[in-house]
Design a protein with these regions (language model features):
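Bacterial Sec-dependent N-terminal signal peptides
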Residues: 1-24
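Beta-strand elements of repeat-based all-beta scaffolds
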Residues: 20-394
Length: 394
């Protein structure tokens, strides 16, 4: 008798799963349950063509045993080379599947009878499959307002020339003429409003220059690398070719590296440099900015880690060798709740009844307060590692 009930239930589920889908099409039905009784859910059906490409996606509203929701569908079209061309905006459909031709004829009604409720991509005639035009959804964008992309090489003309910057062995910045014609790949992009921009890349794919046109005026942002490929300078338009020390300190982004290619000094426009110190495991252990360096007793921000390279402590010290004069700003606890009942974790709301679900996760934290009163936090998780509760001291 029990086996008979199981078979009947299985048959009912099969019939329900196939309901309202087109059985002549390949599809995957996904249901997201909203209640534990499995009677209320969201349905998503993705239909595939004979080549296994998704061409129609149908999303239904909340369904239950008493009513059916409205279906919203999108359509994806491909060209003869299998490339995505037209992506249709979601449209209301009845029934839950429409053949592509029927979908295209009915979709405008969902978008104010706009004749082109889809985005479109146009490709160049080459095996590289690069997009040369992109149209936004709507007839207005299709009437001469695409995002157009052209591919070319650099040259001596004003808009296609690129200054060659290099970093010396001492870390200084030098300009050494222009790149030879045809040695860089240039992408020219024209947006829907006719504004042009250029991106210059070298043969290994690094961006060297981004040029945005403001009418006839070029606004250039240069990216300069050292011989190891590390980004050392970012020169915004305000530099305008003047790479004097004063101008670089005022406008440029500057980075210095050690022999392990770790950034040990960073300088942002108009600020003092920030210094970084690492341990033998390449973990950041100390940092110091200009404000800390200007103090009579120079402060450093220190960082401590556990054996799994997780940050356990962060604060200030006055000596980066002995970490003397320590002021703790952040203290992190992981894996267990053994800290409950110690220090600031003494309130009745800090529970230890966690069933061991904190393994591998941040379970507690102390954050120093501005007024000197730290905030104590505990994080609780379920069996799947999802945070289900957070307790903070007041």
């Amino acid at each position: 008798m029990n086996m008979k009930r199981i078979y009947l239930l299985y048959l009912l589920l099969l019939l329900q799963a196939g309901h309202a889908q087109d059985s002549s099409q390949n599809y995957i039905l996904t249901r997201t349950m909203l209640k534990s009784d499995t009677k209320s859910y969201l349905s998503k059906v993705v239909y595939y063509d004979g080549l296994g490409r998704p061409f129609q996606t149908v999303n239904k509203a909340i369904e239950n045993t008493n009513k059916k929701g409205v279906s919203l569908a999108t359509l994806q079209e491909y060209d003869a080379a299998g490339r995505e061309t037209k992506t249709w905006l979601p449209a209301v459909i009845t029934p839950d599947y429409l053949a592509p031709a029927s979908f295209k004829s009915s979709a405008p009604a969902s978008h104010g009878n706009d004749s082109r409720p889809y985005q479109e991509a146009v490709y160049e005639t080459s095996p590289q499959n690069r997009i040369v035009k992109q149209y936004g959804a709507g007839a207005d964008w299709h009437s001469g307002h695409p995002v157009a992309t052209e591919f070319m090489g650099n040259s001596a003309t004003a808009q296609l020339r690129c200054t060659r910057y290099k970093v010396t062995s001492a870390g200084a910045l030098e300009a050494s003429g222009d790149y030879a014609n045809g040695t860089l790949n240039v992408t020219r992009t024209t947006d829907e409003d006719g504004n042009m921009s250029y991106t210059f890349m070298d043969k290994i794919g690094r961006t060297l220059l981004e040029r945005r046109m403001n009418g006839s005026e070029a606004l250039d942002t240069y990216y300069v690398y050292d011989n190891y490929g590390n980004l050392c300078y970012v020169l915004p338009p305000a530099i305008n070719g003047n790479i004097s020390t004063d101008n670089l300190n005022l406008y440029a982004y500057q980075y210095n590296y050690d022999g392990c290619n770790r950034c040990i000094r960073k300088k942002l426009p108009g600020t003092q440099y920030i210094e970084y110190v690492y341990d033998n495991s390449d973990r950041l252990t100390f940092s110091q900015d200009g404000s800390q360096r200007a103090l009579s007793a120079q402060n450093w921000t220190y960082y401590k880690y556990d054996q799994l390279n997780r940050l356990t402590e962060q604060g200030l010290c006055t000596n980066k060798v002995t970490t003397s004069g320590t002021t703790v700003h952040i203290m992190n606890y992981y894996d267990s709740y053994s800290f409950i009942g110690t220090q600031g974790f003494t309130g009745s709301n800090f529970s230890t009844d966690t069933s061991g679900y904190g393994k591998g996760a941040l379970t507690g934290q102390m954050v120093a307060g501005i007024n000197g009163n730290p905030v104590w936090k505990a994080f609780y998780y379920d069996i799947r590692g999802r945070e289900v509760k957070r307790v903070e001291s007041n």
